[in-house]
Amino acid sequence: MKTTLRIVTRMLPAYGVFPLVFSFIFNCLVYSGSRMIAGGWYHHNIETGLDRSLPFVPQFLGVYFGCYLFWAVNYILIARQERHRVYQFFTGDFLSRCICLVFFLVYPTTNTRPVITDAGLWNQAALWLYSVDAADNLFPSIHCLVSWFCYLGIRGNQKVPVWYQRVSMVIAVLVFVSTLLTKQHVIADVAGGVILAELCFCIGRKTELYRIYEKFGSRIEQKILEFTEG
């Protein structure tokens, strides 16, 4: 355990370890926990005519699945920033999941997925995805929320090349498209995820809320330092 933490603290500053790890854990708890609670409840379908007119393009699952690597890389980059920037970002990140949890429980949504009868790699991948990921917890889209956070968190950071900031924005937009063309989400889900990311990121940056998180995180940081240096 000590060796693992030492390796991690070579990649990340000690103050970035807890916010990053907790972000992942809390995201899983919100997504899985809300499904356990509200899975059997009535779910609203907020599809529009435009959503139904969009084609099903299973090849976009390459983007949909590939975004997990994008998330990992960018969240690590964000956790390597200055202390106050790290806590500002992850305060917004935490707040966004709290709001997602409220929506998932108060106004659970679903959508209509296509009936897949054709064979082929991408169609089989879509069938597998549909079998393991129920059509719930859709509004706002966490896929779109996190992808936009990946861009917001490095936007304007002088330590991150401008070209990569732009690439991150493009990847985030491609993720939005992938959620629609794989019929995992509808347009309202995408818009909700982006708006929520912008709102919570702004709250993290413009208010003093992050100091509460920083105060708590600093205690864990000290424990990490004592453990790895002891």
PLM feature segments, named:
Residues 118, 135-139, 174-202:
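Interfacial helix-loop-helix junctions of multi-pass membrane proteins
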Residues 1-71, 126, 224-230:
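N-terminal transmembrane-helix/juxtamembrane module of multi-pass inner/ER membrane proteins
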Residues 151-155, 197-205:
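Hydrophobic transmembrane alpha-helices
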Residues 70-74, 147-152, 170-178:
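Hydrophobic, membrane-inserted alpha-helices
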